[in-house]
Amino acid sequence: MPAKQATKTAVSRNNTLRLILTRYADDAEGVLARLTVPQSQFDNLLQLEGATNDRVSGEANFLPGITVHELVFGVPYYHIINAAFTYARPGGTRFSSPYRGAWYAAFARKTAQAEVAYHYAQGLREIDWREKEVVSYREYLADFHADFHDLRKKDRHKDSPFADCLDPVSYHASQRLAADLLNKGSAGIVYPSVRYKGGTCIACFRPALVGNVRQGEKITFTFEDASRAPKVRVH
């Protein structure tokens, strides 16, 4: 779908929510930090960790999809911001490629929870997991003040021209659109949530636009099995 059909909207939104597994949270103590070894050995271990850590590789300008000049440094939770762009999933996600990630967030907590719960349950189904599963996430809040391409319907009486980009299963059309917009300098995309009716999500393409990142609540999902909606606890 041509990028020219996606119009821009001035977005000024505080307190968007992104959920990150607590084991990846910025305040989680690293494994290496607990080791008592000579400094020379510790430095070697850090280099080894960096060789297998996409975020570290990106900050060293070793990744093909994003340059170090686009990443951020010296701001709170910059590692969390950079990780969103350097840890690209195999096959990509709705608006990102296998080589470059994006900062996905929701405008409301219920939307963020629904998006995360869907994808986690999908992962459980893929491995035929049939036992109880309890998993915890940390909210990361961020503010956005920029022009984003907007895929939300302007006329509720007409079909969305971006319906194929909001397909619940296929990411082919959405990734093509995102790649086109990214190459044209887009800040990112605002779009209706596919997993929570009436919800709104944002996919930011530029690390520098992810503003004022801070931690929110801890969210725990309890899946009795992968076929049922989880119980959610905010604490």
Named regions from a protein language model:
Residues 94-120, 190:
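Extended catalytic/binding region for NAD+/ADP-ribose chemistry, centered on the ART fold
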Residues 1-67, 71-96, 121-235:
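Active-site and NAD+-binding cores of ADP-ribose-processing enzymes
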